[in-house]
């Protein structure tokens, strides 16, 4: 065959010489496209730019403006970094280096930890290698040949990866004298890498196993141009200012203490108040939507966890104890007690759906290396609910949860994205049950009218799920809400209801959280608002500030009125300058400062000032109460 035909995204066909590559296709369309092309898609699969085309293939050309481009750029930049490290530190052993949502990383086994000065040297070497315009080439070897190659190079981590793959052939990428094991695709040349920055260093165990060697993980990011990179780095600097761990200390919200234990939060008065506000909000919103509030025990017999499948699939993340020679598991999830409530009496189809809601505290054994402030802890409280319904009610219930999420996230000012995660390799339940559950979730997503993605193989072991990822003020994604469909646990615990025909049927269970872990959500809120909580959420809504000691009696009376009316108010009657006291209240990010001087005492008023410095009209204490109540009612 001397000629082939390929189909372009618009449906048109284009003839090419046999053996033509994606680059040749781009060049045949135009010189500008050939210059902009970095990779391609053949029949939906990402491939390198020089990949040969087959007759009848559906082809798409990837440029820096394509949605897929950033991952390719970042993956190639991680290889460039590994090449630079090997050039500067020849004894370093390379392991893995994927692209991630915020950039990329690469793990190295080195004799000494990298320093900030080392990162500067690595970056400089990367720039040198990028300018060298090295060709990035893909080749396939048999696994035996690839193992021999990497053994000869002393790269035993790569040998282990190839052995674990168990494939007949593997693909390698080379650029200059650097060779790496990789599926690809990659950029055509190192000169295509134009804008990057190494951002941090961390420790990471090989394959996440604490019994394996500790490696040095170097994080970085890369973009198509320097303008995008600079904008991202500016967001990173802003994120550092908003870091919930930093603000948590400054605002006296929470702390951690090694004497207490890693990953266990100690809530201070202001933090506990913030938590209480959220929990009260949750209870009110759930009651409005027909949920029943329930509460289960902290420990349950190990036999129950064995019956549920948690012991088999999740026990490495659980804590166990023995009481009176009986083994118990500290709950990592709230579902089992809810099933016991359902089983406590005979259920009719007329009773369904039942919606059990619990602000349940759970404990999970997270590895020390992954703990991160409030975002990853070992003890946390979930706004956990389980809906038990008939199969016919399932679609409506899932749609109801998606609507619930939409309304709640609107109150907090979050946009969100949805992702359907399907059956993982390690799972329980029949094929039919998984198919039914997956289709129910998919139908609800389609009917929601919102965009969604499908994440193959990332569902929970007991059912498919919808993950809902919030977008914060810095355009970061946070996974909080989850909707999981479960046909398995009702069967394991023999949950039934009597149908209209008098026969016993199996209910469907939906596990769902709206905010997710309260701790994690508070961490996200702190960073989203930079600690400047809206009035309805603020642990302290106002502080009364006196000008001199002469105003203390009136200010105290006003304080008592506000507090009695339910306003979260504090006072600052110290013998300090007014400017000092106002500045301190601003640093504590309190929404309103109520200044009391001689004029306010004489008029029976307060002089409100917003934390940004804007002065409001004077108000009586009663007027200020109404003002705050109005803000709280409208979630301002």
Curated annotation (Swiss-Prot):
One of its GO terms (biological process) is threonyl-tRNA aminoacylation. Pfam families: HGTP_anticodon, TGS, tRNA-synt_2b, tRNA_SAD. CDD domains: TGS_ThrRS, ThrRS_anticodon, ThrRS_core. Its EC number is 6.1.1.3. Residues 243-534 are annotated as: Catalytic. Gene3D superfamilies: 3.10.20.30, 3.30.54.20, Anticodon-binding domain, Bira Bifunctional Protein, Domain 2, Threonyl-trna Synthetase, Chain A, domain 2. Its cofactor is Zn(2+). It comes from the Bacteria. Zn(2+) binds at residues 335, 386, 511. It catalyses: tRNA(Thr) + L-threonine + ATP = L-threonyl-tRNA(Thr) + AMP + diphosphate + H(+). InterPro entries: aa-tRNA-synt_IIb, aa-tRNA-synth_II, aa-tRNA-synth_II/BPL/LPL, Anticodon-bd, Anticodon-bd_dom_sf, Beta-grasp_dom_sf, TGS, TGS-like. Homodimer. Catalyzes the attachment of threonine to tRNA(Thr) in a two-step reaction: L-threonine is first activated by ATP to form Thr-AMP and then transferred to the acceptor end of tRNA(Thr). Also edits incorrectly charged L-seryl-tRNA(Thr). This is Threonine--tRNA ligase. It comes from Citrifermentans bemidjiense (strain ATCC BAA-1014 / DSM 16622 / JCM 12645 / Bem).
């Amino acid at each position: 065959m001397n000629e082939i035909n390929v189909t372009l995204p618009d449906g048109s066909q284009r003839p090419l010489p046999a053996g033509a590559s994606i680059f040749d296709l781009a060049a045949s369309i135009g010189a500008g496209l050939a210059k902009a092309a970095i990779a391609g898609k053949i029949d939906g699969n990402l491939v390198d730019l020089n990949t040969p085309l087959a007759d009848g293939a559906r082809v798409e050309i990837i440029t820096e403006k394509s949605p897929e481009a950033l991952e390719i750029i970042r993956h190639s930049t991680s290889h460039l970094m590994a090449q630079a490290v090997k050039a500067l530190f020849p004894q370093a052993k390379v392991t893995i280096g994927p692209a991630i949502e915020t950039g990329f990383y690469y793990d190295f086994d080195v004799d000494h930890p990298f320093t900030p000065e080392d990162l500067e040297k690595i970056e400089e070497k990367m720039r040198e290698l990028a300018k060298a315009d090295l060709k990035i080439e893909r080749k396939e070897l048999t696994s035996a040949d690839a193992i021999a190659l990497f053994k000869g190079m002393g790269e035993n981590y790569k040998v282990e990866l190839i052995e674990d793959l168990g494939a007949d052939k593997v693909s390698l990428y080379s650029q200059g004298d650097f060779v790496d094991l990789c599926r690809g695709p990659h950029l055509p040349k190192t000169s295509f890498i134009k804008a990057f920055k190494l951002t941090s260093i961390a420790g990471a165990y090989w394959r996440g196993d604490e019994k394996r060697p500790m490696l040095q993980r170097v994080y970085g990011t890369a973009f198509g141009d320097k303008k995008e990179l600079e904008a991202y780095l500016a967001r990173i600097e802003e994120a550092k200012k908003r870091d919930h761990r930093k603000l948590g200390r400054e605002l006296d919200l929470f702390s951690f203490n090694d004497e207490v234990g890693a990953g266990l939060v100690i809530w201070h008065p202001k933090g506990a108040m913030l938590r209480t506000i959220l929990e009260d909000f949750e209870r009110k919103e759930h009651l409005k939507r027909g949920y029943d509030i329930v509460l289960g025990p902290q420990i349950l017999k190990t036999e129950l966890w064995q019956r549920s499948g948690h012991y088999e699939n999740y026990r490495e993340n659980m804590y166990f104890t023995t009481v009176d020679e009986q083994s118990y598991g500290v709950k990592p999830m709230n579902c089992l007690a809810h099933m016991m409530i359902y089983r406590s009496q005979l259920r009719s189809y007329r009773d369904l759906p039942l919606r059990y809601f619990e602000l349940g505290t759970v404990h999970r054994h997270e590895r020390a290396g992954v703990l991160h402030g409030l975002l990853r802890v070992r003890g946390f409280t979930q706004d956990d609910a389980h809906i038990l319904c008939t199969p016919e009610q399932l679609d409506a219930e899932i749609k109801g949860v998606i609507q619930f999420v939409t309304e709640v996230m609107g109150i907090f000012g979050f946009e969100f994205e949805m992702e359907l995660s399907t059956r993982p390799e390690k799972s329980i339940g029949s094929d039919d049950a998984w198919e039914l559950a997956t289709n129910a979730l998919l139908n609800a997503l389609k009917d929601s009218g919102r965009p969604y993605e499908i994440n193959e193989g990332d569902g929970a072991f007991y059912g498919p799920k919808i993950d809902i990822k919030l977008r914060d003020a810095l355009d970061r994604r946070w996974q909080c809400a989850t909707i999981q469909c479960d046909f398995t646990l009702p069967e394991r615990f023999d949950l039934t209801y009597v149908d209209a025909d008098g026969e016993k049927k199996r209910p469907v269970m939906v596990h769902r959280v709206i905010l997710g872990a309260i701790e994690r959500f508070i961490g996200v809120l702190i960073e989203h608002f930079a600690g400047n909580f809206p009035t309805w959420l603020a642990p302290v809504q106002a502080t009364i500030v006196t000008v001199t000691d002469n105003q203390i009696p009136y200010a105290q009376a006003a304080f008592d009125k506000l507090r009695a009316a339910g306003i979260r108010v504090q006072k600052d009657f110290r013998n300090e300058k007014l400017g000092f006291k106002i500045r301190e209240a601003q640093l504590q990010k309190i929404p309103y400062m109520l200044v009391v001087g001689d004029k306010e005492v004489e008029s029976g008023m307060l002089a409100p000032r917003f934390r940004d410095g804007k002065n409001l009209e004077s108000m009586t204490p009663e007027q200020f109460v109404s003002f705050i109540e109005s803000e709280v009612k409208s979630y301002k």
